[in-house]
Amino acid sequence: MRYALLIRQDENAAISAQERSRRATGLAAFQAGMRARGALTGGEQLQPAETATTVQCWDGGDMVIAGGPLGGTKEQIAGFLVVDCKDLDDAIGVATRIPAAWYGTVEVRPVRETGAS
């Protein structure tokens, strides 16, 4: 079963260039291991939240378009991975090994299989 791992981070947290490099190296190693296992089926890093545009329309009303991400949290979605795991426990285990989980939040969500992909 496929799971989306939504990686959330505080984009305003100050980190050194050395720490940024350490994190990038850790993510690359994690992704290489997942590819070798045949479990990484997709994913991308996202541009900063300030580049987001939010589109909302409730109950068929007027469309509201706003610059920026949906508010309410200091952590923003920084990227996502799509992994193929045997079950939720396996996906949670994978999420705990993502370096971003050590300094942010990883939301694990099953992918709805529609047959369209």
Language model: regions and residue ranges:
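Conserved, structured core segments of small domains
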Residues: 1-117
